[in-house]
UniProtKB/Swiss-Prot annotation:
Name of the protein this chain belongs to: Ras-related protein Rab-19
Domain notes: Switch 1, switch 2 and the interswitch regions are characteristic of Rab GTPases and mediate the interactions with Rab downstream effectors. The switch regions undergo conformational changes upon nucleotide binding which drives interaction with specific sets of effector proteins, with most effectors only binding to GTP-bound Rab.
Binding site for GTP: 26, 28-32, 42-45, 49, 75, 130-131, 133, 161-163
GO MF annotations, alphabetized: GTP binding; GTPase activity
Keyword Ion transport attributed: no
Signal sequence interval, chain numbering: none
Cellular component terms per the entry's GO annotation: endomembrane system; extracellular exosome; plasma membrane
Reaction equations catalysed: GTP + H2O = GDP + phosphate + H(+)
InterPro entries named among the record's database cross-references: P-loop_NTPase (IPR027417), Rab19/43 (IPR048040), Rab_GTPases_membrane_traffic (IPR050209), Small_GTP-bd (IPR005225), Small_GTPase (IPR001806)
Cofactor(s) required, per the database record: Mg(2+)
Length: 217
């Protein structure tokens, strides 16, 4: 497909550019989350990521064009050396776990340690509990995730479902707002969380028991 120089220039015109890495154990649904964010499409069967996959999408945040580079990393041990090299230039990290598999939640401290060891200082970290559509198979309480996030000083916890389009957009909008706020801290001195509607009106799961799916720390 051919793009004119003017089309390329328009695509390259942005106010902010942020690099975000998506990490976590294998088969927690990281690729499904990224694909849904990119195209709004959910694919039931996804092959495991080999090394690192790269996706770009621009968001309009309060009249500013924010280009989000999302790096979907493989969770398998044999790819760790490759994926660790991508930590260094990341502005933010999203750690994903599968709320139907307790072991993926228990791995979160390991992933936080990886970020602290290989990432830059002051990387913004968010936690997402994926597959919240499978609430009847839940093995991780939302309250446990909030407690862990508070312990490690993470930005927020959201429960997501790529299959049912729950909180996928909100994850990246919240992250973009926080990164903009931190980038402009010397001007505004406030966190993006101060003005986010989700804080005062938590998202509720439509199917199954009524539960909060978003908390900020």
């Amino acid at each position: 497909m051919h793009f004119s120089s003017s089309a390329r220039a328009a695509d390259e015109n942005f106010d902010y550019l942020f690099k975000i890495i998506l990490i976590g154990d294998s088969n927690v649904g990281k690729t499904c989350v990224v694909q849904h964010f990119k195209s709004g499409v959910y694919t039931e069967t996804q092959q495991n990521t080999i090394g690192v996959d790269f996706t770009v999408r621009s968001l309009d945040i309060d009249g500013k064009k924010v280009k989000m580079q999302v790096w979907d990393t493989a969770g398998q041990e044999r790819f760790r050396t490759i994926t660790q090299s991508y930590y260094r230039s990341a502005h933010a990290a999203i750690i994903a776990y599968d709320l139907t598999r307790r072991s993926t939640f228990e791995s979160i401290p390991h992933w936080i340690h990886e970020i602290e060891k290989y990432g830059a200082a002051n990387v913004v970290i968010m936690l997402i509990g994926n597959k919240c559509d499978l609430w009847e198979k839940r093995h991780v309480l939302f309250e446990d995730a909030c407690t862990l996030a508070e312990k490690y000083g993470l930005l927020a916890v959201l429960e997501t479902s790529a299959k049912e389009s729950k909180n996928i957009e909100e994850v990246f909008v919240l992250m973009a707002k926080e990164l903009i706020a931190r980038n402009s801290l010397h001007l505004y001195g406030e966190s993006a969380l101060n003005g986010l509607p989700l804080d005062s009106s938590p998202v509720l799961m439509a199917q199954g028991p009524s539960e909060k799916t978003h908390c900020t720390c």
